[in-house]
Amino acid sequence: MTSAKPFPITKRQVWEAYKRVKVNRGAAGVDGQTLTEFDGNVVNNLYKLWNRLASGNYLPPAVRCVEIPKSDGRVRPLGIPTVSDRIVQMVVKQVLEPVLEPVFHEDSYGYRPGKSAHDAIEQARKRCWKFDWVLEVDIKGFFDNIDHPLLLKAVRHQTQERWVVMYIERWLKAPVQMPDGTIMTRTRGTPQGGVISPLLANLFLHYVFDMWMQRHHSNVPFERYADDVVCHCHSQSQAEALFRDLKQRFTQCGLELHPRKTRNGLL
């Protein structure tokens, strides 16, 4: 029975998570198992997954790193979890996202239900008629440099579910299998490509940026899509002062502004 398990995770939650993962498809992780292969014994696979998850015995495997070429010649590391791990991450996401959505800032647009990049662009266009200067903010290697203790502090502030915090902490510590097969440990960051990563990234910047802006620069409206931000200022001096403050703020939180992509300008 579900009630006999240490954590109140139901078979229904695992089933619903599986259905969402199946719709999203995705490549195989380090175990090489495809979604089609998982489906070959889906009932048994989901039962075993639920049993480990509700018992507190689920341990995330390593994440498979795939390097995606970028237009500037560099590569973007993408983390591919196993099918089972994607399902477990979706279980946690389905519990945590409804808690966080009402808390998140209205001008945070990335990876959120009912919001899009087009919404952010439309809002920015409207504000550009009222403000003459913008500060474009980009965080260098954001996903790879998220501070684990700060993120876990934010998670604990938003949920009392011990198992949610426990599994998020395990994911943050899960190693990465590099393209050459070597295993790398992680002390910072959350892999791009994980089901839970975008939600955790938004939670991190909710405190590092959104709430900080409300407290210290409440007269500066902004649109944020993940780690890309447009801030609207009345003057060059205001934009430059905001840049200095943000640089210090991000440094305090273990992040760095991208030197080429962060800039201010007259509209």
Residue positions per predicted region:
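Conserved phosphate-binding loops in nucleotide/dinucleotide-binding enzymes
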Residues: P77-T82
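Short alpha-helical scaffolding segments that buttress acidic/His motifs in well-ordered protein cores
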Residues: A17-V21, V91, Y167-L172
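Short, compositionally biased low-complexity segments
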Residues: T10-G26, A62-C65, Q94-V99, W129
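Duplex nucleic acid-engaging cores and interfaces of nucleic-acid transaction enzymes
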Residues: S84, V88-V91, R125, L152
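Non-catalytic, polymerase-adjacent accessory regions of viral genome-replication enzymes
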Residues: M1-V43
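Electropositive, glycine- and tryptophan-enriched low-complexity nucleic-acid-binding patches
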Residues: Q89-D107
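Conserved polymerase palm-domain catalytic core
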Residues: R52-E67, S71, V103-L267
